[in-house]
Design a protein with these regions (language model features):
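Conserved pre-ATP/AMP-binding loop-to-beta segment of ANL
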Residues: 15-18, 130, 150-172, 179, ...
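Conserved AMP-binding A3 loop
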Residues: 30-34, 168-194
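Gly/Ser/Thr-rich phosphate-binding loop
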Residues: 252-256, 264-335, 431
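Conserved AMP-binding/adenylation subdomain of ANL enzymes
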Residues: 191-206, 213-279, 283-288
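Conserved C-terminal "lid"/linker of ANL adenylate-forming enzymes
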Residues: 407, 432-435, 440, 472-514
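AMP-binding/adenylate-forming catalytic core of the ANL superfamily
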Residues: 88, 105, 360, 366, ...
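Conserved AMP-binding/adenylate-forming core of the ANL superfamily
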Residues: 20-64, 68-72, 89-94, 144-149, ...
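Structural core segment of the AMP-binding/adenylate-forming
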Residues: 6, 76-147, 440, 450
Length: 514
């Protein structure tokens, strides 16, 4: 099965169903599956006519209908799409364009200031298409998306179907530690993941897409899986506008990372008890939201219970870019709070020294031009996830830490900091916490929840006293080696990657971030 087959089947089934909705200022615009497919085909044929068959083509931009049409135009033909993080600085984007050997680029209008730098510093880059219909005063080698599509419309030849083992896309990991790696995913990797994920939606089901589109989680679960079921993908134009856009698009389903769920809950919890939960849910969620799928970090089951009070079911899953990306997920029919669900039917799971190992049709081909890193991650056909976990008697998977984050104390005891962090984070005064290993034991580095600090008018000494009292209670229930012996109260939030994960290598830096 190829992504092209999945998309063509969707157009046959759902041709006049609305595929995409988005905001243009205050107006909601929309396109049907048939309309989207026309642009996908003209893009694909245009790329073939321009000689980009078998080439790597980068995309830089936030979620837009032009972005997804261009991406699908690339991967349904015989080229490889390289979606890049639009939030990265110019010099890092230049590095990734060059490291991925990209010879063409689709670029959002917001990134036009980077254009000269790309042309000057990316020697393999032959052509750039701006992700807008009409553009003026473009330098040599730069065109509008309409010019490429017009060429495709007039071209007689269409690209042949790609091979199932051809590289469809190269997705760069966030690089929270060390150099980011380009994950090579084949046509079969993506298609098998789309088919194996057990999510059912009726045609026209509204899905509000709020995650960055270059993420494998967003790209595969929102767009490819959503399109396979005839869903209507609604584009969130900004995280700042997410709650407003929920009331506009009235989604049935959403994908979120835990941090978003926690942020929304704070808004719910801040409302007075006199407001009925049904009224509050209508105001915050838009009135139709039934399910939130989440992954990417630990979510405390507390939030699952709280959201259920508002009629919203939260289902956790587990995955990584290297697995296209989903490995396991909870479903509306089969779920267990605290778990990350049962493994998909197309993957095998085993454990080696507590580490989760994965094998299956969704597992990547390797890291682009990084043979040593590929060999280290893929051993005897098994992908070493770097996550520690276990499976219960009902077949549900649980994670309890990262292998590389393991703290080895001087007495030889091993501690997974995430297990402790998840417990400490339950305190309302704790906004962010990282546990580090020091010479004298474990230290909790905590950034206080500013809303609580302000509401209770806490000064620095009061914050320290309350947190220390909380740690004292925690320590009483723990063996000696798991007790917190040090407390550092931060003035600023931790530095995060563009995927909103705390960069553990930078936890000692406590400075305001731009």
């Amino acid at each position: 099965m190829l992504i092209r087959n999945i998309l063509e089947e969707s157009v046959q089934k759902f041709g006049e169903v609305k595929a995409v909705k988005w905001l243009n200022r205050k107006e909601v615009l929309e396109k049907s599956y048939s309309e989207v497919m026309k642009n996908v085909i003209s893009t694909r044929k245009g790329l073939l006519a321009e000689g980009f068959e078998g080439k790597h083509i980068a995309l830089i931009g936030t979620s837009s209908v032009e972005w997804i049409e261009s991406y699908l135009g690339i991967i349904t033909g015989c080229a490889t799409a390289v979606p890049l993080d639009a939030a990265l600085p110019c010099e890092e984007l230049i590095d990734l364009i060059n490291r991925s050997d990209s010879e063409a680029l689709f670029l959002s209008p917001k990134h036009r200031p980077y254009l000269e730098a790309f042309l000057a510093n990316c020697p393999k880059l032959q052509k750039v298409w701006m992700l807008q219909k009409e553009v003026e005063d473009l330098p040599s080698g730069v065109y509008s998306i309409n010019e490429l599509r017009d060429m495709g419309k007039s071209a007689a030849e269409d690209a042949s179907c790609p091979d199932a083992e051809a590289i469809a896309t190269i997705i760069f990991t966030s690089g929270t530690t060390g150099k980011s790696k380009g994950v090579m995913l084949t046509q079969n990797n993506l298609a098998s993941n789309v088919e194996a994920v057990k999510i059912s939606a009726e045609p026209g089901t509204a899905m509000l897409s709020v995650l960055p589109i270059h993420h494998a989680f967003c790209l595969v679960m929102d767009w490819l899986k959503g399109f396979s079921q005839g869903a209507t993908i609604c584009i969130n134009d900004s995280l700042l506008h997410m709650v407003r856009n929920m009331s506009i698009f009235k989604p049935d389903i959403m994908l979120m990372v835990p941090m978003m769920i926690e942020t929304i809950y704070k808004r719910l919890a801040a409302a007075g008890p006199e407001i009925p939960k049904a009224v509050l849910a209508e105001k915050v969620f838009g009135g139709k939201l039934q399910t939130i799928f989440t992954g990417g970090a630990h979510l405390d089951p507390y939030y699952i219970d709280r959201f259920a009070e508002y009629g919203v079911q939260i289902l956790e899953g587990y995955g990584m870019s290297e697995c296209s990306p989903v490995i396991s997920n909870n479903t509306p029919e089969n779920h267990k709070p605290g778990s990350i669900g049962r493994p998909l039917e197309n993957v095998e799971i085993k454990f080696e020294n507590g580490e989760i190992l994965v094998k299956g049709t969704s597992v990547m081909k390797g890291y682009y031009q990084m043979p040593d890193e590929t060999a280290e991650t893929l051993k005897d056909g098994w992908l070493h996830t770097g996550d520690k976990g276990y499976m219960d008697e009902d077949g549900y998977l649980f994670i309890n830490g990262r292998v590389k984050n393991l703290i080895i104390l001087s007495n030889g005891e091993n501690v997974s900091p995430e297990e402790i962090e998840n417990k400490l984070a339950l305190n309302p005064l704790v906004a962010e916490v990282i546990v580090t290993g020091e010479e004298n034991g474990l230290t909790a580095r905590i950034y206080p929840e500013q809303a609580v600090v302000e509401a209770k008018a806490l000064d620095t000494e009061m914050i320290r006293l309350q947190l220390q009292a909380f740690l004292d209670v925690y320590n009483k229930s723990q063996p000696t080696y798991r007790r917190i012996t040090g407390l550092v109260i931060r003035k600023n939030p931790f530095i995060r990657s563009t995927t909103k994960k705390i960069r553990r290598q930078d936890v000692l830096i406590d400075e305001p971030q731009a």
